[in-house]
């Protein structure tokens, strides 16, 4: 496969839903006006539309177009920042990293792992949160969050031979539960401890979870359909859900509602996100990608 073909395939796979995510973000934008983002109602429509069209390209907007006020690369669709870095990873892979030997790739993964640990243990918040703004600090966070998972995944694919592990789904699920059950460790006086926990979870536990999941067997047709559904919807829900999170978060901030009273609205937000994502997948993403494959990848 040529470099040009590789880039075409990545664009066909990712870009249609990038556009849809920005459109949904634009439609929902003015409904997000709240005490968290008190200037939204002052944003002229032409500026919001301009931000939307720039977002179609995933090019980060400059600070002058930060229409939300959160210093986001993509104010209409927050998660777009990570896709921006994914494209950087794809470019690095196509131009350089794909030619690396296993030894060279291992060195790159080791260094990027060290960079991730350094980021986490020296962070003023003791974690790896960030990466969505266009300044030196946030770019450092974004690149550190990109490099190890992206190239570590490539190394894992190259060197690991999958076997069949009994109850792989059970073990991987238990690991996920353990990690999520301990979102933070240590005290506010020792933030480095949580930074070390976060970074080692990313470096050791998450690759292990991926390996276990890939080593399992699916024998039930029902389970197979569920897995396919979750796999198909994962990207659409990722790139479209945040518009509804903005609305929900702003509403909670305005009403100061108790957590116990907010559960129905939380569930409604979750269900809405899933339904919209699935509709986008079936009515837009799959047909558009099929058409693009015939036109561009033939």
Residue ranges and their predicted role:
Residues 1-5, 61-70, 96-100, 131-276, ...:
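Alpha-helical transmembrane segments in multi-pass integral membrane proteins
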Residues 5, 81-82, 237, 281:
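Active-site alpha-helix of zinc metalloproteases
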Residues 5-6, 14, 82, 105-106:
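Alpha-helical transmembrane segments and their helix-entry boundary regions
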Residues 10, 14-23, 203-204, 266, ...:
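Alpha-helical transmembrane spans of integral membrane proteins, capturing the lipid-embedded, hydrophobic core
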Residues 14-87, 115-124, 128-129, 200-214:
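Membrane-interface helix-loop-helix regions
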Residues 24-27, 112-115, 155-156, 247-248:
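Hydrophobic transmembrane alpha-helices of multi-pass, membrane-embedded glycosylation machinery
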Residues 27, 111-125, 174-187:
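Aromatic-anchored segments of alpha-helical transmembrane domains
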Residues 90:
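Short, conserved beta-strand/beta-arch hydrophobic-aromatic motifs that form part
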């Amino acid at each position: 496969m040529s470099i040009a073909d590789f880039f075409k395939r990545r664009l066909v796979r990712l870009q249609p839903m990038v556009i849809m995510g920005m459109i949904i973000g634009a439609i929902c934008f003015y409904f997000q006006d709240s005490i968290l983002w008190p200037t939204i109602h002052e944003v002229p429509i032409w500026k919001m539309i301009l931000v939307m069209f720039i977002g179609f390209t995933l090019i980060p907007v400059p600070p002058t177009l930060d229409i939300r006020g959160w210093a986001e690369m993509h104010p209409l669709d927050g998660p777009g920042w990570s896709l921006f870095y994914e494209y950087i990873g794809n470019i690095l892979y196509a131009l350089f990293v794909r030619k690396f030997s296993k030894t060279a790739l291992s060195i790159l993964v080791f260094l990027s792992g060290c960079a991730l640990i350094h980021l986490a243990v020296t962070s003023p918040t003791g974690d790896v949160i960030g990466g969505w703004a266009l300044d030196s600090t946030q770019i450092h966070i974004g690149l550190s969050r990109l490099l190890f998972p992206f190239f570590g995944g490539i190394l894992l694919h190259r060197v690991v031979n999958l076997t069949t592990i009994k109850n792989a789904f059970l073990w991987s699920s238990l690991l996920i539960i353990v990690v999520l059950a301990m979102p933070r460790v240590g005290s506010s006086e020792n933030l480095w401890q949580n930074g070390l926990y976060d970074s080692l979870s990313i470096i050791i536990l998450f690759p292990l979870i991926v390996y276990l999941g890939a080593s399992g067997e699916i024998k039930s047709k029902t389970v197979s359909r569920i897995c396919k559904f979750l796999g198909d919807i994962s990207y659409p829900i990722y790139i479209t859900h945040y518009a509804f999170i903005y609305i929900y978060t702003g509403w909670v901030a305005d009403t100061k509602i108790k957590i116990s009273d907010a559960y129905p609205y939380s569930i409604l937000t979750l269900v809405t996100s899933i339904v919209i994502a699935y509709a986008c997948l079936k009515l837009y993403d799959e047909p558009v990608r099929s058409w693009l494959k015939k036109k561009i990848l033939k």
